[in-house]
Amino acid sequence: MIFSAVRVSILGFLFTYSACAATLQVGSQRTLKLPSEAAKLAKDGDVVTIDAGVYPGDVAIWPQQRLILRGLGQRVHLDSEGKSAENKAIWVLKGNDITVENIEFSGATASTLNGAGIRFEGTHLTIRHCHFHHNQMGLLTGVNLLSDILIENSEFNDNTVDYQRYGKLGHNIYIGNIRHFTLRNSYIHDASTGHNVKSRAQENYLLYNRISDEHNGSSYLVDLPDGGQAYLIGNLFHQSANAENAAMLAFAAEHHQTEPSQQLYVVNNTFVNDYRGGSFLNNHSIATAVLINNLLLGQATVIVGPNLQKHNLMNVDARLKYPATFDYRLLPASAAIDQGMDPGLAANGFKLRPEFQYRHPLGGEVRPRQGAIDVGAYELSGK
């Protein structure tokens, strides 16, 4: 009877919480015309839907917990026109358990030169189907060792600061010291002078992304300055000839170089490097980086730092489908076909064999299983 009473009480609480949650609608034909108006009215657990359109100069602070902030229809565009809330970002998210979907963020600047599309100051964030561009920073987060962040099916590009003028870097993605960061099925490109992806998370999972310079030259494609545990699987990496740094990937460049428990797994990625004399990886730590089934193409010929290599192919006749447009799928005559091995499990039990592959733009698809695995980010279908 006591258990039943407690159960009824819990169910009653859940029902009350669910009943209190509301959906706030924003749009030119709605009572709430701007997202910033909804930010002042929303309660914990609410859903805020925003009609498609451009919302110029509108910035907001969201202090609530458990929010879903969702654009409807064609992309909702928050063009801040140089403004930022709290001199930080278009949206400053202070609460926990926040989801942001189908929204475009651009134009953020701040006097501190780190005006972001989103500044996240809470615990646990999910970003889906969003586009961050032409801000000083795309996404910027703080330190929170309890926080997990997931970005999927999203695009970040051209978030930067004029380094020649100000001497500071802007990054497409800058993740602070959090517990767990996952980036998957996303398109991260053209971080001029800054990094495409910079993360100080304790665990980093970069899965099935296209991370590339293309029109600009980034500092690093991926910078993990504090090391940690990192799993880079099934990505396309392209570094341009005018990149700021020689290395495509940097691991533990700033801290924890002598920490023996760090782990770096680089599995079934395709690297194309147009930077003459560059390196695919610069591992600054004493930990041994594990590289398996990677396709390594272009001007770079070096992997710097302790490493263990298995079934990688360097500068072979890869026969990529449309390399000039960064389409690195394999043609039937590629030397990468059936040349890989089953990479097995990481030390923590994480499966290293790629289950998916990137599909442009901003998508993923199941990677076929046909005979021995192909080297690189793509499996030739129908072989």
Residue ranges and their predicted role:
Residues L24-S28, H284, P368:
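Alpha-helix initiation/capping motif
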Residues R7-Y17:
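Bacterial N-terminal signal peptides
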Residues R7-S9, G27, G376:
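N-terminal non-cleavable signal-anchor helices
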Residues V48:
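Glycine-rich N-terminal segment of FAD-binding domains in flavoprotein oxidoreductases
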Residues S36, D51, P56-R329, A333-A335, ...:
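Extracellular beta-rich repeat passengers
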Residues S18-E37, L41, R319-A324:
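Right-handed parallel beta-helix/beta-solenoid
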Residues M1-S4:
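N-terminal secretory signal peptides that target proteins for export/translocation
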